[in-house]
Amino acid sequence: MTKVKRYNTLSLNKLSAAVESGKKVDISNIDSMKASNITVIKRNGSREPFNPEKMKAVCLWACTGYEYLADELIRDTEIKLHKEINIRDMFQQVIVTAVNKISLLFPQWEDIAAKLQLLSYYKETYNIGKSISYPHLRDILQKGIENKIYDKRTIAKYTAEEIEELNNEIDPERDFLFSYKGLVTFFDKYCLNYTKTKKLELPQHTYMRVAMALMVNETDRIKKVITLYDALSKHQYTCATPIMLNALTPGQQLSSCVLNTLDDDSHSILDTGKNLGIYSKFKGGTALDISPMRAKGGYIEGTQGYSSGPVPFMRYYESIMKAWNQGGKRPGALAIYFSWWHLDVFDILSLRSNGGTDENRARGLQYSIKLNDYFIQKVINDEEVTLFDPKDTPDLIAKVGDEFIATYENYLLRANVRRKKVRARELWEKIFKERSETGNIYMFHEENVNNTSMLNRYIGSSNLCVEVVIPSRPSKCISEELITTENGDTRIVKKYTAGEIALCNLSSVNLVKWLEMSDEERMRLVRTIVRALDNTVDVANYPVKEGKYSNTKYRYLGIGVMNYANYLALKKIVIDTQEAAEETDALFDDLSYKIISASVELAIEKGKFPGFYETEWAKGILPIHKANTKAMGLTSRKIDWDKWTALAQRVKTFGIRNAQLMAIAPTACQTKESVIKTDIGNESLEELMNRQNIDHKSIETIGDQGWFDFEKPINVPTRFGNKESTRIWYNGKVPTKKITFEDGNTYEFSLNHKLLAKLPDGTESWVYVNDLTIDMEIVKI
């Protein structure tokens, strides 16, 4: 039996009662901290004795709703303080203490850490305290203009009265919606600096900046700016990084996805490198289709030499990505697309391999192989396929389906074509070997992409993250000449046929917020997102003109979702079940219908996209009409064809504003990197998603694990304060230890629970239950 010394102690019973009743836990009598020998260096350089009451006040503020944890936070921070400490370092120690306590069992520490981190940002940026008085928007805009961070021409369109009205709409309380990691990511990544080390913006300024930039040219713009600000700051949806970083800046490049294609000539290869570097500089993620590039050993007419093949050029593009990183915020990124029948396909597949020398590797790029039904059937039949040099087989590029087969077999009959026969399964195994060893090699199915496209054009690649499928084509230099002007200056004039660099602007709906909305609120949110994203096409700066040509002609948007797993969890649906498939089908049917409807409404207001009559939209055909029938057959949900037919007629009659509307970007789902925090309820996400479908009965009837139903609701601590709960999921796997005290009470603790114990050397420390030994004296539970 372990001895217990009791002073200033809250028993588990008292603590539970306090939490259940919603009362704050009084820690005013905690032992005074050992402050006598600690000196604090303040921000202005002055020194003063450490005052534990100040730290206590901060910790109690951060632990609002979780006051019972403040004692632990203070004590665990105290032991880290040394004789002389900078106030910034001391504050950081409090934050680190809270962060280190975050776990699945104790998620409330994330709220505490987020509040502490937020207070640190307030102090460092504008010396704001717990009262949270944001600096005026007018002052932020002025400082941004003075430091050439903001575009003064855009800001000049807003009157002083409008800026005052927008300032009044800023709600600092929404800063508390962030998780700890989300706050750190957002502040470091999206809140702009005015010097290398000084932040210009706080989080709500960032959201307002984006809203002002995207809605500046709207009629009734203040109302629309506020609506967009509300949607962003309430985390109903999120914009992609280029929008969050570049909106309202002088170099306002807002596209996330940049798709390029090159020609098999030196001008195109080098011009493509320049274009990739420029877009990477402005935070775009890039992709490049190299299918036309001739293979190693191909003859070069202009120099009477022989090509070194794609590999050296991939190293060239890799160097560009390293040099032109995304504004210093993240590394440059490029995905290379190539055809399965390319003569050098095995060399390209090996470019990320851990083996080999640096001379024949380009490990900093991503790679995607373009497959089709012909090749897959050869794999199934275990037959041979023939690889070709694209220089000798130019007509094979941009062919799919029966056209590909006919052209391919025609080249098989020609004698003057460089080729190589391999087993289809040998190539297939190489693809999966590289995938397993490097985690890369995307697979792009040309026929699936082109058969379901709305654009009636060949699409030869996707983007960096393989969710956007839109066409691109290279510019061609048709003339280059010297011209002497009237004043004697000499100029070089180059003329190109206009190619297309396909651009797409992304946003993602937060499905957890979506779940809370009425149908009317959902439609209102979708209208706001479509309008805001569509405006990016017009307000954006285009550093490469091929991008402007494509974007203004087709006005591509990519609206997707985030927090999909959380959405299913909150609906009590296991992710890998038929029920999840049915729910997902219904969700995206509804979302797609609303997004297309919003784009039609915008077309009525502002006009259809210029390339409308080239596409399937003009025929009244919708994406659901071209969807993969096998995929649609995976669910039993009946489609409401009446509503889709009516919508198709509206599209045919009035047009649509955007040639493409949806794309599921690879957003984080309730991970530590996610900027947006969501409430997953009182259950662990992992436990909920992995459990079997069982009857919701009590533990007594199920055994070691299952749902435990309370006789009456109790208040339990969650990441948003105390909430009422009627049941709990018990997985039966948490190891515990029982401890009996001198008063006869026996308590059962999980092994990762901490108790304050006096160690054999007489010092006190918080010790995990698992680490307790018989020679320790428990001081506090």
Where are the predicted features?
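Extended catalytic cores of very large enzyme megasubunits
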Residues: 2-675, 707, 748, 778-781
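HINT superfamily self-processing domains
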Residues: 60, 669-781
